[in-house]
Regions:
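Accessory cap/linker subdomain of secreted extracellular hydrolases
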Residues: 1-66
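Short beta-strand/loop motif that positions the catalytic acidic residue
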Residues: 67, 73-75
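Acidic beta-to-alpha connecting loop that harbors the catalytic carboxylate
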Residues: 77-79, 104-105, 317
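Conserved alpha/beta-hydrolase "acid-adjacent" motif
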Residues: 79-85
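Extracytoplasmic/secreted proteins, especially bacterial periplasmic and envelope-associated proteins
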Residues: 85-88, 114, 118-122
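Glycine/threonine-rich phosphate-binding loop and adjacent beta-strand/alpha-helix elements that clamp
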Residues: 92, 115-117, 127-366
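Catalytic histidine neighborhood in serine/cysteine hydrolases
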Residues: 94-106
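Catalytic histidine-centered segment of alpha/beta-hydrolase-like enzymes
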Residues: 105-114
């Protein structure tokens, strides 16, 4: 971008970009925009705030159909963002391909040490012509958290799934049954978040299921439908899904993220439990209006064991350091909201806020 525009045009574009309070409030981005020399890659990313031609010409998914050599994709579970792109890339490939989804970190060095023997077998087949049966193996392999089993199949997800809703209810409950009463009785939940420039505390709402009574397996992606009202033109909606054990220990299962101004859906691609957002423009929110926001729950594979609970947390920022984020590199989180925002989350008969998850179908025993 620095080469494509005059200094005067760059200055004008930077000033416009800094009108976004999220960008202006974050020191690293403010510095990059004002001193782009030697930070050209970051500068271009920050300046291209919505999807479009600049990203498409660099998008591996767009380029994937041109690849005609064998591809083996490996990704480990965690927050789910990179899993989603890896799976989409796998779908776009036309040649021989394999997808392995490994366990939750801590991971080994990359390439993953535990996969070395498999790599050697693939090299022997494709480079040396040794018929060792590697191509007879299933195309998709998924480590399922909780049960710690490996599930294989010909595609993603490797099992048939049924997307079923769990509804947000009063008293912070998640239930298969929707709330039967109106907002006059089921008053909304809510939270106020000050910018992280003035506080270190990230406000969090949570809802949880009753303890599971039998092993419950979920593999795939999902959706969260939130009926929300905010008092600003924009905010973030950040969900984190946890497997909580009877003793209180927790493991992150997956996440979902949506900037409120990017709430538009690609209606042609979106299906139940599988939403797509084009991210090609930002549409400010009308403060005080109740909107339905549909978040994409990133892919995961997990079995909730008897006695465990599914806990869903909602915030508009990611905690800079907690039991999970403390393990991540600096700035490995979404850009915090730079303005104070009050959020109301409606979950009543007229506003069925819910999370739609990929329950695997049980095959009847013969």
């Amino acid at each position: 971008m620095l080469e494509a525009y005059s200094p005067e045009e760059i200055e004008e574009r930077v000033a416009k970009r800094l009108q976004d309070p999220d960008v202006a409030a974050w020191p690293n981005l403010f510095h990059v925009l004002n001193y782009p020399k030697n930070h050209e890659a970051w500068f271009d990313i920050v300046m291209n705030e919505v999807d479009g031609e600049w990203y498409e010409e660099r998008n591996p998914v767009t380029l994937a159909p041109n690849i005609d050599i064998p591809v083996w994709l490996q990704i480990d579970q965690g927050r789910g963002w990179t899993m989603d792109g890896t799976i989409e890339l796998c779908h776009a490939l036309n040649g021989p391909k394999k997808l392995d989804i490994g366990p939750y970190p801590p991971m080994q060095s990359r390439p993953f040490v535990e996969e070395h023997d498999k790599m050697v077998r693939r090299y022997e087949y494709w480079l040396k012509g040794i018929d060792n049966g590697v191509m007879d193996e299933p195309a998709v392999s998924v480590h399922v958290e909780g049960s710690r089993e490996t599930v294989t199949g010909a595609q993603w997800p490797p099992k048939d799934v049924e997307h079923r809703p769990l509804y947000l209810r009063t008293r912070r409950a998640l239930s298969p049954e929707p709330e039967p009463t109106g907002a006059e009785y089921a008053a909304p939940d809510g939270f106020y978040q000050a910018p992280l420039t003035v506080t270190d505390k990230v406000e969090i709402l949570s809802w949880s299921t009753a303890p599971f009574t039998e092993p419950t397996e979920m593999i795939g992606q999902g959706a969260a439908h939130l009926f929300a009202e905010i008092d600003q033109p924009d905010t973030n909606f950040i969900l984190r899904l946890w497997d909580e054990a009877p003793g209180g220990g927790r493991q992150l299962i997956t996440t979902a993220y949506l900037k409120a101004s990017h709430r538009e859906l690609d209606e042609e691609r979106t299906t139940e439990g599988d939403p797509y957002h084009p991210h090609t423009r930002a549409v400010p929110v009308e403060p005080g209006r109740i909107e339905e926001y549909v978040l994409r729950v990133y892919p995961f594979g997990a079995t909730f064991l008897p006695g465990h609970k599914l806990v869903v947390e909602l915030s508009n920022d990611e905690p800079p350091a907690d039991a999970h984020n403390a393990l991540l590199p600096p700035d490995a989180f979404h850009l915090p909201v730079g303005r104070p925002v009050t959020h109301k989350i409606y979950r009543d008969a007229a506003h069925p806020s819910r999370i739609v998850l990929p329950f695997t179908r049980t095959v009847p025993s013969s």
